[in-house]
Amino acid sequence: MHKKLTKEVDYMDAVLYVCHGSRVKEGADQAVAFIERCKKNLDVPIQEVCFLELASPTIEQGFEACIEQGATRIAIVPLLLLTAAHAKHDIPEEIQKVYERYPQVEVLYGEPFGVDERIVDILVERINETNVDKHEDSMVLLVGRGSSDPAVKRDLNEIAQLLKGKGAFKEVSTCYLAAASPNLKEGLHLAKRTSYKQVFVLPYLLFTGILMNEIKEELEQLSTDAQQFILANYLGYHDGLAHILSHQVKTLLSSKGNQYDVYRYA
């Protein structure tokens, strides 16, 4: 997809942020608000937001909006936590469809956030923000979106181990909202069977949406006098996340794209 350049070229740069999308309008609105705040950290003339599914503008519409403003190089940045099918296949396929109509445009493709200790620090903050005094006998149930890609389970387990150390918890277990096991009900059931007096349920999600509502519904009436279930907030906007995203964009635009081929997952 990338042209081999023999001399320096002056580009009109653009950034196209690809969010997942949500049936819940608030979730899509939060994604846009997050990007609007992140834009201020970057000196890039053209910055657009689009969605993979369930919301608009689409990837095609976002790409074309960049072209209409004169972009000659577009850094496409997936606003996703972990690398799974969306980042490896779905987004690249959509990019390829529209790129074929604009082969003169240089396209760079970025990475999801991945395993990052700075994000784990934010998770600790979200637990602390519950304003519940942490019992020495407590655990965390880290709830991921889920994927059939084994790399997602590997990465979430790594994040769980980092969280266990940083948050000084005796145990951090994982479960998933879809496409992987244990699922949410199973994860909660396993936590219920433990002797821990507190279970912090921590959604590993960027924004609210149907999945966040599902977690809330499952948590209703689980707490007892002997065991307390506490729902922490999703990641949402955080200056630390904005800094990570800005750094990713700057790195991408300085790379000339030769290691950011959308086919690298094939």
Curated annotation (Swiss-Prot):
| GO terms assigned for molecular function | metal ion binding; sirohydrochlorin ferrochelatase activity
Q: Which reaction does it catalyse?
A: siroheme + 2 H(+) = sirohydrochlorin + Fe(2+)
Keyword Translocase on entry? no
Residues given in the record as Fe cation binding sites: 20, 86
One Gene Ontology term of the biological-process aspect is: siroheme biosynthetic process
Look up the EC number in the record and give it. Answer: 4.99.1.4
- Pathway(s): Porphyrin-containing compound metabolism; siroheme biosynthesis; siroheme from sirohydrochlorin: step 1/1
Instruction: Describe the task this protein carries out.
Output: Chelates iron to the siroheme precursor.
Q: What is this protein called?
A: Sirohydrochlorin ferrochelatase
- Whose protein is this, by species? Priestia megaterium
